[in-house]
Swiss-Prot record:
GO molecular function: aspartic-type endopeptidase activity
Protein name: Lipoprotein signal peptidase
Signal peptide: none
GO terms (BP aspect): proteolysis
Pfam families noted in UniProt: Peptidase_A8
Role, per record: This protein specifically catalyzes the removal of signal peptides from prolipoproteins.
Length: 166
């Protein structure tokens, strides 16, 4: 690795660690509250509550099942996806590598929970006039931001490069 690639590698590693640590800190705080309270349902604003649920599925509780074979298969698949994301991050030489680092940091946070707790603690409850969005966590926020930014880069910047070549 040359100096620039090594610097980028360390910067990506820092991004992943910061996201992971921030996610773990928020989850540990909520879990500490759950030890004291019988249930965690904290009113913050008219549109935001902290409400702890345990997600055994994947994003937004999809495929939430109790079968250990299916659960283990999904967990292994998620681990392989994380490896693929890190590979894409390392192979990228542009701004996209930082978005892959955001996704990897969030994915590591949720993967850690799946391994340690066999479920992911979700606790951010956004709602508006009775409509509740899926309950999620900080890792999900960083994954979403990373994916959204990758889509924007692909739509607006990579598309321009393709048009300029033609």
């Amino acid at each position: 690795m040359n100096k620039i690639n090594l610097k980028n590698f360390y910067l990506n590693l820092v991004i992943i660690l910061v996201v992971f640590i921030f996610d773990r800190t928020t989850k540990l705080y909520i879990l500490k509250l759950a030890e004291v309270e019988t249930s965690v349902d904290i009113y913050i604003t008219p549109f935001l509550n902290l409400f702890l649920i345990w997600n055994k599925g994947i994003a937004f509780g999809l495929f939430s099942i109790d079968g250990s074979v299916i659960y283990n298969s999904i967990t292994i698949l998620i681990g392989l996806i994380i490896i693929a994301i890190i590979f894409m991050m390392l192979k990228n030489d542009n701004i996209q590598r930082y978005f892959f680092a955001l996704i990897a940091g969030g994915a590591f946070g949720n993967f850690y929970d799946r391994i340690v707790y066999t479920a992911v603690p979700d606790f951010i409850d956004l709602h508006f006039y009775g409509f509740h969005w899926f309950v999620f966590n900080v890792a999900d926020i960083f994954i979403t931001i990373g994916v959204f930014c990758l889509i924007l880069v692909e739509l607006f910047f990579n598309n321009k490069k393709t048009n300029e070549k033609n």
